[in-house]
């Protein structure tokens, strides 16, 4: 849904790295190298960034009653 600010497992701040990670991967860079360059070393943080799917634009269409 929304970009996670912290890793769900360890609590490290990762929200500031997501958009740079996404942009570099979309340009064709290897995700492993990008995560290494950004300093994301823990596998739990890497998993959180790699598996995140942005659904907020699709969910915003529905109204809350």
Curated annotation (Swiss-Prot):
Its cofactor is Zn(2+). The keyword Chaperone does not apply. Pfam families: RNA_pol_N (PF01194). Its main location: cytoplasm. GO terms for biological process: DNA-templated transcription. One of its GO terms (molecular function) is DNA binding. It is an enzyme of class 2 (transferase). Zn(2+) binds at residues 7, 10, 44-45. Binds 1 zinc ion. Its EC number is 2.7.7.6. Gene3D superfamilies: Homeodomain-like. InterPro entries: RNA_pol_su_RPB10, RNA_pol_suN_Zn-BS, RPABC5/Rpb10. It is found in: Cytoplasm. One of its GO terms (cellular component) is cytoplasm. Keywords: Cytoplasm, DNA-directed RNA polymerase, Metal-binding, Nucleotidyltransferase, Transcription, Transferase, Zinc. DNA-dependent RNA polymerase (RNAP) catalyzes the transcription of DNA into RNA using the four ribonucleoside triphosphates as substrates. Belongs to the archaeal Rpo10/eukaryotic RPB10 RNA polymerase subunit family. HAMAP family: RNApol_arch_Rpo10. PANTHER family: DNA-DIRECTED RNA POLYMERASES I, II, AND III SUBUNIT RPABC5, DNA-DIRECTED RNA POLYMERASES I, II, AND III SUBUNIT RPABC5 FAMILY MEMBER. Part of the RNA polymerase complex. This is DNA-directed RNA polymerase subunit Rpo10. It comes from Thermococcus onnurineus (strain NA1). The gene is rpo10.
């Amino acid at each position: 849904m929304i970009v996670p600010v912290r890793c769900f497992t360890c609590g490290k701040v990762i929200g500031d790295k997501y958009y740079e990670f996404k942009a570099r991967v979309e340009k064709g860079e290897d995700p492993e190298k990008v995560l290494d360059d950004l300093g994301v070393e823990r596998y739990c943080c890497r998993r959180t960034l790699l598996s995140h799917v942005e659904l907020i634009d699709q969910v915003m269409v529905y109204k809350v009653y």
